[in-house]
């Protein structure tokens, strides 16, 4: 699905124009209300700076948290406006509401090259309902629409989908374009062999991804808590490990489907067990067919790491979504860290490595290897849905290229 990008609009199209840019500024805040990680703000800078270079009037729209359609003082975008001002080296004017007379007057007072940040769109109940009247009023502030919020592209909300009915052109920003290029590209035209590493604690949250990837991949590597559902489905004893009893048949069916399609489907051969779920639990290494009663698996073992590394050696594209174990606990982070290091090495050899959002991004950043990967996705749910082959409303609403 090829969409029109901001790069198709020159200064002659944008000079003096009011441009509504949907960004993803849903950043983590500390106890004092300070921003603890500004990655998402920095990710929007190429789009914002390009618009400023083309003398546009930039009106930013973003959500923060889940205020459920009413004003919540702890979810205002004040800290974001301040940080963005520092990054841009110019004052970003913030409105008190995203619509209404005050917002309109601040937008009307803009000159070319000015930036206004509209207050949290989710303070208005019409945002998540994709209310037409709200979308129309939001759109009335601008003339052109740019969506650079890949992290919210799987939502059909007023600011991601509704406004496109009232503005033209509607194009993808540079972050959105990059996300689609890598994630869509990896699925539609990968350099093969293509491997997917799927981790995380639950099969249920990754069913769609696994089903879709079995149709596209040469190899699938499974790690994280979900492996125990596969083991139990094979008739193995898993001790106190996490199992989704209602997904046993599905686990068997996924393995069977992979086999029928000639896809290499790899599960760990050994695991690190713990006697309870805590960072300082007693631990021991065990083969997967010899898991002790009363113990639970919290990481993949060293033999499994080697197995996975060998499987990945010849791959030209690797997508990773979900950790190999409870990487938040130092004792059970080895498997996840080893995979992160392996992918960094593969990247250096020319393999396209894509970290598909969520916890794997946190794991790669914790290991200090983010810069070594080909692409780190900024979307959690959006990345998953794209990998599942779903159409993202925020993307489909944009003009075709």
From Swiss-Prot:
It catalyses: (2R)-3-phosphoglycerate + ATP = (2R)-3-phospho-glyceroyl phosphate + ADP. Keywords: ATP-binding, Cytoplasm, Glycolysis, Kinase, Nucleotide-binding, Transferase. GO terms for molecular function: ADP binding; ATP binding; phosphoglycerate kinase activity. Coiled coil: none annotated. Its EC number is 2.7.2.3. The keyword Magnesium does not apply. ATP binds at residues 206, 297, 328, 357-360. Pfam families: PGK (PF00162). GO terms for biological process: gluconeogenesis; glycolytic process. Substrate binds at residues 24-26, 40, 63-66, 122, 155. It is found in: Cytoplasm. It comes from the Bacteria. The keyword Ribosomal protein does not apply. Signal peptide: none annotated. InterPro entries: Phosphoglycerate_kinase (IPR001576), Phosphoglycerate_kinase_CS (IPR015911), Phosphoglycerate_kinase_N (IPR015824), Phosphoglycerate_kinase_sf (IPR036043). Pathway: Carbohydrate degradation; glycolysis; pyruvate from D-glyceraldehyde 3-phosphate: step 2/5. GO terms for cellular component: cytosol. Belongs to the phosphoglycerate kinase family. Monomer. This is Phosphoglycerate kinase. It comes from Prochlorococcus marinus (strain NATL1A). The gene is pgk.
């Amino acid at each position: 699905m090829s969409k029109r990008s901001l790069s198709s609009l020159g200064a002659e199209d944008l000079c003096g124009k009011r441009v509504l840019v949907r960004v993803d500024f849903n950043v983590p805040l500390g106890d004092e209300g300070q921003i603890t990680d500004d990655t998402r703000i920095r990710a929007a800078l190429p789009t914002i700076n390009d618009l400023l270079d083309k003398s546009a009037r930039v009106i930013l729209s973003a959500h923060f948290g889940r205020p459920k359609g009413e004003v919540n003082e702890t979810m205002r975008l004040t800290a974001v406006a301040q940080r963005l001002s520092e990054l841009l080296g110019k004052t970003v004017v913030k409105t008190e509401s995203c619509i209404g007379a005050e917002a309109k007057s601040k937008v009307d007072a803009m000159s070319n090259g000015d930036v206004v940040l509209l207050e949290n769109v989710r303070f208005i109940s019409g945002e998540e309902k994709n209310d037409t009247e709200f979308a129309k009023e939001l759109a009335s502030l601008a003339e052109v629409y740019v969506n650079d919020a890949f992290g919210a592209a799987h939502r059909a909300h007023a600011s991601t989908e509704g406004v496109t009915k009232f503005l033209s052109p509607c194009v993808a920003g540079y972050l959105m374009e990059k996300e689609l290029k890598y994630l869509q590209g990896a699925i539609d035209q990968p350099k093969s062999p293509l491997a997917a590493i799927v981790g995380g604690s639950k099969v249920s949250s990754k069913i769609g991804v696994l089903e879709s990837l079995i149709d596209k991949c040469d190899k699938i590597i499974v790690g994280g808590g979900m492996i125990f559902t596969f083991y139990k489905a094979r008739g193995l004893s898993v001790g106190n490990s996490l199992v989704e009893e209602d997904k046993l048949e599905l686990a068997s069916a996924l393995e069977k489907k992979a086999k029928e399609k000639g896809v290499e489907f790899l599960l760990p051969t050994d695991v690190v067990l713990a006697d309870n779920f805590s960072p300082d639990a007693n631990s021991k290494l065990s083969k997967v067919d010899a898991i002790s009663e009363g113990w639970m698996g919290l990481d993949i073992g060293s033999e499994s790491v080697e197995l996975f590394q060998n499987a990945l050696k010849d791959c030209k594209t690797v997508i990773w979504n979900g950790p190999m174990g409870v990487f938040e606990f130092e004792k059970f982070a080895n498997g996840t860290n080893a995979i992160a290091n392996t992918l960094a090495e593969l990247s250096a050899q020319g393999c396209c490595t894509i970290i598909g959002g969520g916890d794997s991004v946190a794991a790669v950043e914790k290991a200090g290897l983010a810069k070594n990967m080909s692409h780190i996705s900024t979307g959690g749910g959006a990345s998953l849905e794209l990998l599942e082959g779903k159409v993202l409303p925020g993307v489909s609403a944009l003009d075709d290229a």
